[in-house]
Each structure stands twice: as C-alpha cells, then as structure tokens.
Amino acid sequence: MIRKFIPILPLIAALFVTFSCDPTKNNPEVKDTLTVSPASLEFEAEDASAKFLNVTTNGDWSASPSADWIVMERTSGTGKASLPVKVKPNAGEDRTATISFSGADKVTVSVSQKGRNIVTVVANPDSFDGTKRSSTTYQLLIYSFADSDGDGVGDFKGIQSKLDYLDGLGATALWLSPAHPTPSYHAYDVNDYSTVNPKYGTEQDFKDLIDAAHAKGIKIYMDYVLNHSGTGTTWFKDALANPDSPYRNYYVFSDDPSADVAAGKVDNYGGGKNPGMGDWHSVSTGNKGYKGRLHYKLDWNAKTVTVTESTERAQSSNSDAKIWLFIGNDGCVGLYQTSTNVYEITYDTDTTWGFLVRTSTTTWDGGTKWGGDGKPISFGQPYALNNSTAADIIFGGATSYYFASFAQSMPDLNYGKYTECENSPAFQEIAATADKWINLGVDGFRLDAVLWIYQAQIKANQRFLDQWYQRLNATYKAAGHTDNIFMVGEAWEGHNTEKQYYKGLTSCFEFDYFDALTRALNGNASGYVSAVNGFISDHTAQRADAVTSIFMSNHDQHRAAESLGRKLEKEKQAAAMMLTTPGKPFIYQGEELGYYGKKDGGDEYVRTPILWDKAGMDCAKKGVNNKVDNTMLTSSISVEAQDADANSLLNVYKTWSRLRNIYPALAEGTMSVAPGNGNSIAAWYMTAGSQKLLVIHNTATTAKTVTVQDNTSRAVGLLGTATLDHDALTLGPNSSVVFKL
C-alpha cells in the first residue's frame, strides 16, 4: 500500500500569522480605547446651531446626557463617529451638564449654556458734591417769566422768587432778555442803556436778584443790543433835531446814501457796498430856516397863515401895521391889510429858525403871540395858528436818511471805522453803561445781532467784538474776578460763517447744532458725534479758550417741540442728548415744559409765559400782550402738574441737568466715538481726567440691541428702559443710558 505525504507545516504557519495580526484578540496586553473631543461644548442662550463631538474607537460606545436640554441624534454606535449636539433655548440662568460616554473607556464631556440672565438697568448716580459745574444757562424773558406784583408783566422780583426752580433745573447762569427802558414788549429797541425798565422793578430790585442768584451758584448774563438802539434815546432824538448834535455820529446818517456808499463813506458797511439787510429811512432833521423872497398872507378870520415862494417885488415893513410877523433877526415886520381881516406882505426873508405872528410889538403877554403846533409849514398851504402852544412856525428840516438793519424804530449805531471803533463816542458811551452793570454784579453778556454791527463784514465785526470783549473783560477783572467774563454772540448764520466770529468772542451760538440733533433723532444717529466734534474743533482752531454754545431754540425761532413734531418722547431724548453733549447748553424758557408754537401769528406765540400752577393765577400774559395759545397753556403743562409727575419732561430736564452737575466728564469732558453707532444708535465716551462715562442713545421708536464690551455694572443715568444680557444691551424706544466706567 502506498501512503501519500501531505505538507501541513505551511498551513500551520499561515494560521499562526493570521491570528497574530489582531493584537487585541491574540495579545492580551493590547486594549481598545475610546476618545471624545472636544472635552467641552459652550452654547449661547438662543443658540440653534449644532456643535460636533468626534468619537474615536474600534469598539462599541454609548452616550448619556445628564440633562434633558441636551439634544443628541445618536446615543450609541460602533467605531468612529461625528455626533451633532444641540441645546434647547435657555430663558433662565447659566447652566452646565455632562455627556457620559461608555465603551472601551469612560469619557465625560462638559456642556455649558449661557442663560439669558436679563438684568433690568437701574440708574444709581453718585451724590451731588455741591459744586455746580454743568455750565447750563437758562434763557428767560423778564416780561413773561414770573410776575411778582400781579400786574401781568414779569419782573425782577418774580425771577428771584423762582430761583429754587431754576436751581433745580441745574442752571449755572441765567440769560435775561434786555432789561432796559423800551417802548416795546420785547425790549430790543433800547431807549436808555444806563438804567432798568421800571416795569421790571428798580435798580435795587435788580441788584437783589443778582445777589440772590449768586448765593445759589447762578450767574447773571444781560442781553446787550449793540447793533442798534431805539428811536427814543436822548442820542437819537437830539441827532434828529439838530444836524450839529454831538450825537449825530452815534448813528448812520447820510444826506445822500447812494453817493456816500459809492464813495465808501458809510463806515457801518465795513468796507462793503451792500448792507445785506436793512433800509435807509428818510427824516426831516433840525430846522433849516429860510433865505429868500416869500409872500405871507394872514387870514385873521380863519386864524391861518399861507406862505408861498415869490418873485414879486419885495416890500418893506408897514410902519402903520396893526399886526406883525416876527421873523429871524429882523424882529417885527408890519403886514399890509388887503381886505377885511386879511393882511399880506412880500418880504425878503432871512431866518435860521422861522417866524411868529404878533398882535403887539411891546409885549408877549396876554395871548399876543401866535404860532403853530411845532410842525413845519408847507408852502402854499394854510397853516393853523394858535396862541396857546404858539410854537415857532418853522420851515422844516433838511431831508436826511438814517440806516436801520431791522425795523425803522431801531436805528443802527455807528462805531466809525472798524479799525478804530473803540475810539468812537458810541462805543465809549455804551461800554461805560456795561461797566456799570459789571460793577453791579453782572457776570456776562449775550450780544444781539453781531453780524450786522458792520453789515456782515466778518473782518470788521471780528475786530469790533475783540475790542468790546477786551474792554469789558478788563472791567470784569478790575472788579475782582479771577476768571474771564463770559460773552456769547448771536452770529445767526451757518457754521462756516459763525465759526469765524470766535476771532472776536470766546463763544457764539451754534445754530447748526439743532439740525445735527434732529438728524440724530430722525435716523442718522451715527453722524451725531462727528458733527458735534466738528463744531468744537472748528471753534478751538480759532481760539484755544473757545466755548461752543449749543441750544435747541430761542425767542426768535419756532419752538423746539414744534420742530420735533410735538412728540414727547423725542423731546425727552433731545434733552438727554443735549445734556450729555460737550459745550455750553442753553435751555429756553418753557422748553423744559414742552411748550410748542410757531412765529406765524407773531413772535409772542414762541415767547409764552410760564404757567406756574394749574390755575394759572400768576401767569405773566400781559407781558406778551395776552397773545398766548390757550389750547397749549392748560393745567397739564404747568410746573405744578409736571413737578408731581416723575415721568414728566420737566423731571427729565432736572434729572439730566443734575447728572451734568455731578459728573465733570459730562460738563467738561471730551467726546469720542464708542462702538455700536448706527442709524438709530448714538454712542460716545465722555472723558475728563480719570473719569470716563459711556453714553448710549437709541433714537428709534422700537427697541434696539447693541453689543457693549465696556463694564456696564454701574449705570448712573437712564431715560426710558434698558436691559442687559451679558454684553447685549437692549434699549427701549427713545431710551438713553449712561454708564460710569
């Protein structure tokens, strides 16, 4: 029998190799592993996206979340996997949980989710240290602010009685409307710069007001009208009556304006040929008398005299006359009777003043002198005689003209050539009156209509204002003050013109400011900071000590509330924005109460008196000739009503003015852009020394959320509503917040 040999050794070797290639099954020292990465997951409160865990293993695995807010599509498997993990929205506090993995190893992954943690912002400002630093001025109209004696016209004592109110508004100064005697209610046609209007009280009353205001840290600024006076000044009346009057050069007179302007003789034009605004007004000045041949006809029945120019042969005086003319230096000239009670003469007349009619040559008594009523005679027209007034019968004055930038009742003052304006009699006299008020205690001046002093000629006006400022600042220093006098000019023009007036004054009203503010309130908030900083940098480029005076409206404009659409929330935010802006803010009488109105029916309607109580018993309506809008001036808009309402516009002004007094950064700081600016978000920093504040305004009518990286733990100012969710700040409609950093 034959046996076959089967080679089994290679088979054994192959099997050995096969089993040796799986170390986990054939080598007890090599184990499977389980790894999961990352080791932690972090989610936002409203995070809807998935985050992924990477599982690495060759074996089986399982996952177990410790909380039901963790959502996993798979919780078990074999081998490698990429696991999406989501979380449910978290409306509560921050939370953490784990995902435990089992398999070759035990692995724990931590999962955290931020809560919404919505914190309602509450303002907690520092205490007021008693130092008033807000640099906030309240503009008031003496005639309509407060009436102390019940005559319906505001007065000095009325203002003094309301100083606590003004102090509560944070005012550091009061700008008073012109305080001088005047024929008008508004007082911009001054008749005497050296005294006060008796309707407002006495000079002692004014002094008492100044002293009482100073005791509360409130300065007093007078409104001074330098461009023109009223026609009732002693100066103007004398200048009209006498062409040789020493006051003639106080005003801009000309016998031939066109020729004088063309020849460059009108100093008031500042070298220009076109005044830009204003008119020449004709007047008969003085009494020019008459030299020439005249025919006189006296009708003694009608008691009239008719005078005509004549070429007939001249007559000599009638020595047998019963009635006479008294002419010039000739004395009595006898008339010839030509019919019953009619007397005539043709006479070569030479008189510098005029003539009279006399019925006696020996006495002036007993009604023997007959004259007129002071008006000049007109040739060929019967002129009525009387023996009661018996004023000289004059031939009229020379026709002349005076210039007025505004009304005929406001003749422009003349300061001569601008290069030597400080030497002009008008400058010296008016400056002397201002010296008086400084020595009485006045702290500064608002200068009216400075554009027109030299008819919008910038260089001329700059020099005049510089000389005026230097003169009065010297008086102020001599009175014992260590600071400089404050003066603000009304250069009512756009910013590019207005800024040039800082060459003459330390401050001017920025008429473009309210435009920037309204743009911010109407959807262009992101441009607010750059606009304000542009104003300030342009002013300080003119002079280092420049003060930018900002305001919403004044007595010559439509009310701010009118321009804001009478929308209370906008009015509140406008106040908050202005009072957190660098510069010197001015609050106009009634603005803090929400007064609205247009000039269309008369300026009085934007100069409404303050309604102090609901009953309106002490409202100075007569001060504006009783021209008030009674549909606006109701009890709800009164000081009494708004004081009692914590959410009133008045209390917004009080709150934000107080903040400005508390924090130097708001009153004296520099402004810089903060992150978050947008169409409806205006955000900026205010910094002074080591103090820094973050100011954010939402000007939209809906809530807006902005990310804030700064420390928001301390809010010091709040208008409307604000909440914080970590670094997400949500401001309610027309809401504002200030954080102390």
Model region roles, listed by residue range:
Residues 26-27, 116-123, 128-131, 136-138, ...:
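Insoluble glucan recognition modules
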Residues 253-256, 476-617:
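Conserved alpha/beta catalytic core and glycan-binding cleft of carbohydrate-active enzymes
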Residues 726-741:
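C-terminal beta-strand-rich structural cap/linker in extracellular carbohydrate-active enzymes
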Residues 478-481, 551-554, 565-693, 699-703:
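Loop/helix patches that line or flank the sugar-binding groove of alpha-linked glycan CAZymes
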Residues 122-293, 357, 396-421, 439, ...:
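Acidic/aromatic-lined carbohydrate-recognition and catalytic surfaces
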Residues 93-104:
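A short beta-strand micro-motif common to beta-rich folds, especially ectodomain repeats
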Residues 33-34, 52-84:
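Surface-exposed binding patches on compact interaction domains or structured appendages
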Residues 2-5, 9, 13-42, 108-126:
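Bacterial Sec-dependent N-terminal signal peptides
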